Amino acid sequence: MNDSEFHRLADQLWLTIEERLDDWDGDSDIDCEINGGVLTITFENGSKIIINRQEPLHQVWLATRQGGYHFDLKGDEWICDRSGETFWDLLEQAATQQAGETVSFR
């Protein structure tokens, strides 16, 4: 994968997250902001999830209250380089815990 392909795929990921949160109809307030390649999700309780891209490594990094995760693209899925879990699974687990209600991005 070259840098432009990596940015296209990361942009696609950011857009999906932003669209899902724009359509969010849950009870808690969840905000999303993109600034300089960093996507920040802020929850009503003040907690945050930070997602950023690591261009030199062609990785997407996810920082939550539970910990930090690094994802490599394998086929058509972003996969954690330690646990083997998908990006969407870990993001939904963290968002659900931090929002206090079920959050789905798929």
Swiss-Prot record:
One of its GO terms (cellular component) is cytosol. One of its GO terms (biological process) is iron-sulfur cluster assembly. One of its GO terms (molecular function) is ferrous iron binding. InterPro entries: CyaY (IPR047584), Frataxin/CyaY (IPR002908), Frataxin/CyaY_sf (IPR036524), Frataxin_CS (IPR020895). Keywords: Iron, Metal-binding. Belongs to the frataxin family. Involved in iron-sulfur (Fe-S) cluster assembly. May act as a regulator of Fe-S biogenesis. HAMAP family: CyaY (MF_00142). This is Iron-sulfur cluster assembly protein CyaY.
